[in-house]
From Swiss-Prot:
CDD domains (alphabetical): EGF_CA, Tryp_SPc
Location(s), subcellular: Secreted
Effect caused by changing residue 213 to N: In FA7D; results in severely decreased clot formation in coagulation assays
Outcome of mutating residue 252 to V: In FA7D; results in loss of function and lack of clot formation in coagulation assays
Pro-peptide positions on chain: 21-60
Site (Important for S-112 for O-xylosylation): 113
Outcome reported for the amino acid change (mutating residue 139 to Q): In FA7D; Charlotte
Annotated ranges, domain Peptidase S1: 213-452
Keywords: Blood coagulation, Calcium, Cleavage on pair of basic residues, Disease variant, Disulfide bond, EGF-like domain, Gamma-carboxyglutamic acid, Glycoprotein, Hemostasis, Hydrolase, Hydroxylation, Pharmaceutical, Protease, Repeat, Secreted, Serine protease, Signal, Zymogen
Gene of this entry: F7
Name assigned to this protein: Coagulation factor VII
(3R)-3-hydroxyaspartate: residues bearing it: 123
Length: 466
């Protein structure tokens, strides 16, 4: 029995001397069960050290418990190839498993450090994402933003005016009365009363006014400092906008029926028509200039430039609105959603006029949207390229009679600009209709040329346009 077992063991172990030893044991007839075994010249068993020299193989610690223990990342996925399900058992979390599997299954795509200029890399499946520092952009953060800034993209980062030409870096400029700061994009005032600023708010560390003029609010005193009130024979005529100490912009249709030009007065710093508070300044209008293309009784080219008899004095309550450069107005200001209109017009259609200056925040519309909305109520207004629509179609808010000629003022990065002139509309705050404004950007060069030219005789002049 022992002999058979020994032979089987020898065969399994493949030991040549083992069988011979077995034969000796059998021949001697010794039974290990009956008497103690003594070492002899032929041994069946070897020492542990000798056995290890023949049978030794590497084993993982606790290998016999492998199926009983929770998964180990080292054991399952690094010593051996693991599956997604095995990795999921290890992490116990789908998101962490996905992050591991991306790197495990196709390698770390960030290993080559593809992100430049200090960018950080995030590994993805067969891809990667670079998170760039603020001054850089591109797939690998390889491009400095300053090298790619163009004026059509957020005004090139400029606070006011932007210029660029093919093959050159964009440059920022500032309006008259401002200077460019060292950062190359910001503008700072160089005069006490620069255009487009509201001194009352500046001193309160605020930036925008609180706030037709149907459904609007009272413009707090001093918060619409460029607003002009035009009077003829002492009666309210229209509104206007101060653009420097001697020039005012208004609507041409306001002067269709004027006969006594010497009684045309512009009032600055006005707020409440029922009282005089000492901040008002009155100037006689010396000249009214309208485009040669304007036809009385119509709405196209509805703009007028007024020269005052004497310059006004700039104060906290009398400040000009900036007349923007044309490209800046068309490329940037035209896409500012909301702007302010102001005036002392009727508070309701055919109602009483306002005693206090009113202001309203109105949204600007694309011309096509304006036409589509108007057609829904059976109207087909003639909106030319010299006009634009703004306001609300629900009949709640609008400019109205008496507001004509007043400003449509647009705020951009801390400064206000003249973008429109209150012109015409179908009634006041009529459902389905919008207010129509003269598009000032079309007349920038015309206005600037007239303001640079020598005064000509006459009160009402027609100047060639364009």
């Amino acid at each position: 029995m022992v002999s058979q077992a020994l032979r089987l063991l020898c065969l399994l172990l493949g030991l040549q001397g083992c069988l011979a030893a077995g034969g000796v044991a059998k021949a001697s007839g010794g039974e290990t069960r009956d008497m103690p075994w003594k070492p002899g010249p032929h041994r069946v068993f070897v020492t542990q050290e000798e056995a290890h020299g023949v049978l030794h193989r590497r084993r993982r610690a606790n290998a016999f418990l492998e199926e009983l223990r929770p998964g180990s990342l080292e054991r399952e996925c690094k010593e051996e190839q693991c599956s997604f399900e095995e990795a999921r058992e290890i992490f116990k979390d789908a998101e962490r498993t996905k992050l591991f599997w991306i790197s495990y299954s196709d390698g770390d795509q960030c290993a080559s450090s593809p992100c430049q200029n200090g960018g950080s890399c995030k590994d993805q499946l067969q891809s990667y994402i670079c998170f760039c520092l603020p001054a850089f952009e591109g797939r690998n953060c390889e491009t400095h933003k300053d090298d790619q800034l163009i004026c059509v993209n957020e005004n090139g980062g400029c606070e006011q005016y932007c210029s660029d030409h093919t093959g050159t870096k964009r440059s920022c400029r500032c309006h008259e009365g401002y200077s460019l700061l060292a950062d190359g994009v910001s503008c700072t005032p160089t005069v006490e009363y620069p255009c487009g600023k509201i001194p009352i708010l500046e001193k309160r560390n605020a930036s925008k006014p609180q706030g037709r003029i149907v459904g609007g609010k009272v413009c707090p005193k001093g918060e619409c400092p460029w607003q002009v009130l035009l009077l003829v024979n002492g009666a309210q005529l229209c509104g206007g906008t101060l653009i420097n100490t001697i020039w005012v912009v208004s609507a041409a249709h306001c002067f269709d029926k004027i006969k006594n030009w010497r009684n045309l007065i512009a009032v600055l710093g006005e707020h409440d028509l029922s009282e005089h508070d000492g901040d008002e300044q009155s100037r006689r209008v010396a000249q009214v200039i309208i485009p040669s293309t304007y036809v009385p009784g119509t709405t196209n080219h509805d703009i007028a430039l007024l020269r005052l008899h004497q310059p006004v004095v700039l104060t906290d309550h009398v400040v000009p609105l900036c007349l923007p450069e044309r490209t800046f107005s068309e490329r940037t200001l035209a896409f500012v959603r909301f702007s302010l209109v102001s005036g002392w017009g009727q508070l309701l259609d055919r109602g009483a006029t306002a005693l206090e200056l009113m202001v309203l925040n109105v949204p600007r519309l694309m011309t096509q949207d304006c036409l589509q909305q108007s057609r829904k109520v059976g109207d087909s207004p003639n909106i030319t390229e010299y006009m634009f629509c703004a306001g609300y179609s629900d009949g709640s808010k609008d400019s109205c009679k008496g507001d004509s000629g007043g400003p449509h003022a647009t705020h951009y990065r801390g400064t206000w600009y003249l973008t429109g002139i209150v012109s015409w509309g179908q009634g006041c705050a009529t459902v389905g209709h919008f207010g129509v404004y003269t598009r000032v950007s079309q007349y920038i060069e015309w206005l600037q040329k007239l303001m640079r030219s020598e005064p000509r005789p006459g009160v009402l002049l027609r100047a060639p346009f364009p």
